[in-house]
């Protein structure tokens, strides 16, 4: 498994960079293959919205200038990663300009996967968790705004797939000068938990059976049978009336999705509960 640590700070020292160092130190101590990307050391060009926003980024999902500025190679590293830690200083309640520039270009290439020339293409963020760290030099009042900024950018880059959980956020960590010590501990624990969560058995196959049962096989060859009839018969889910609809269940990650309903209903196979 590969962790990509993406740094949006222009410094190689100070508050924000100390969290970059903590993320790398944690990954190394856990035996996680990791790499730090210091965006400030790159010379990425800003998105030029080629052809009125309908350039090769839209149709073929790479940047026409990306071979020269390093963006296309960086996007390949995003593809190869299994999880991400984004670390940014907070400037005017938003992520840093370097990180914003990178996310603008990445969003142009990834959010359009469903609409371009390759209909089977999926976002490089699909089913990959992210931790977002926002470090403020003052009291931290700008951190919520930076989180919203990052959530919107990463969520959009996750593609036009439903459910939006495909671009997952494992944790948001707000940092200031006074809480930095215990927030470093929190970051270390978050990385450990994120990879423990990632290593859980994934669904291999799901077979709907009679009486609203699902026979599930995981990728470690473990098998389980889940009975969801008590949930299905509740008043709130009365629209799901027959086994025909049940057999249309689709599988994503560890969740079952019922598309026939007006609202997409999710069942967590870990707990057997509606989400």
Identify the meaning behind each predicted range.
Residues 79-81, 126-127, 210, 252:
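Residue-level preference for short coil/turn positions at secondary-structure junctions
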Residues 28, 125, 219-223:
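A short, structured loop/turn motif at beta-sheet edges
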Residues 40-42, 136, 170, 209, ...:
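Short, solvent-exposed coil/turn elements at secondary-structure transition points
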Residues 113-163:
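Short, glycine-/small-residue-rich phosphate/pyrophosphate-handling segment
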Residues 1-111, 115-116, 163, 172-177, ...:
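N-terminal beta1-alpha1-beta2 submodule of the flavodoxin-like/Rossmannoid cofactor-binding fold
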Residues 75-76, 121-123, 248:
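Short secondary-structure boundary/capping segments
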Residues 11-13, 138-140, 265:
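Short, acidic Gly/Pro/Ser/Thr-rich loop/turn segments
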Residues 195-275:
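Motif-centric detector for short Cys/His coordination patterns
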């Amino acid at each position: 498994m590969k962790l990509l640590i993406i740094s949006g700070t222009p410094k190689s020292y100070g508050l924000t960079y100390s969290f970059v160092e903590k993320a790398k130190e944690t990954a190394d101590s856990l035996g996680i293959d990791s790499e730090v990307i210091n965006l400030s050391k790159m010379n990425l060009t800003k998105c030029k919205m080629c052809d009125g926003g309908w350039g090769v980024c839209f149709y073929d999902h790479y940047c026409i200038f990306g071979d020269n500025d390093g963006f296309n190679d960086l996007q390949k590293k995003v593809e190869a990663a299994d999880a991400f830690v984004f670390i940014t200083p907070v400037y005017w309640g938003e992520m840093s300009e370097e990180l914003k520039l990178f996310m603008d270009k990445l969003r142009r290439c990834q959010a359009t996967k469903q609409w371009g020339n390759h209909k089977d293409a999926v976002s490089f963020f699909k089913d990959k968790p992210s931790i977002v760290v926002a470090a403020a030099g003052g009291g931290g009042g700008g951190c919520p705004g930076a989180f919203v900024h990052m959530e919107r950018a990463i969520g959009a880059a996750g593609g036009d797939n439903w459910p939006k959980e495909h671009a997952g956020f494992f944790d948001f960590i707000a940092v200031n000068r006074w809480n930095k010590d215990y927030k470093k501990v929190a970051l270390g624990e978050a990385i450990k938990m994120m990879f423990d969560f990632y290593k859980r058995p994934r669904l291999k196959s799901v077979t709907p059976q009679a009486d609203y049962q699902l026979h599930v096989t995981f990728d470690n060859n473990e098998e389980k049978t889940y009975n969801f009839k008590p949930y299905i018969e509740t008043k709130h889910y009365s629209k799901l009336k027959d086994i025909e609809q049940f057999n249309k269940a689709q599988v994503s990650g560890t969740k079952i999705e019922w598309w026939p309903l007006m609202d997409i209903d999710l069942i967590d196979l870990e707990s057997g509960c509606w989400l």
